[in-house]
Amino acid sequence: MTQAKQSIPALYDFIKERQANPVAGSYTDYLFTKGLDKILKKVGEESTEVIVAAKNPDDPAFILEVAALTYHVLVLMVERGITVDQIATELASREGKKSRLQERSKIEKY
């Protein structure tokens, strides 16, 4: 397995830097210029594309779509002022907790 050259925290920092110092013509700058509604639209689109790609187990697009969704979620996090550390803290707070299925909404098969 090769080591990833781009970590999620590094990508987050890159996006945050682009927000602070826009580069004309960059896609990241475009998203921040268009604002929250455009960013939310892209997160929704990418989420749908992940779901569609996941339905086909042989679809190599799944990894591409998960990467695109991750990027757009990170843009959303920067826009909202949420850090990677905040997400890591929330995930850590859930570690080892028992799931109480009776408290969750039932997921129906579609």
From Swiss-Prot:
Its EC number is 3.6.1.31. Pathway: Amino-acid biosynthesis; L-histidine biosynthesis; L-histidine from 5-phospho-alpha-D-ribose 1-diphosphate: step 2/9. The keyword ATP-binding applies. GO terms for molecular function: ATP binding; phosphoribosyl-ATP diphosphatase activity. GO terms for biological process: L-histidine biosynthetic process. It is an enzyme of class 3 (hydrolase). It comes from the Bacteria. Keywords: Amino-acid biosynthesis, ATP-binding, Cytoplasm, Histidine biosynthesis, Hydrolase, Nucleotide-binding. It holds the Pfam family PRA-PH. HAMAP family: HisE. Belongs to the PRA-PH family. This is Phosphoribosyl-ATP pyrophosphatase. The lineage of its organism: Bacteria, Bacillati, Bacillota, Bacilli, Lactobacillales.
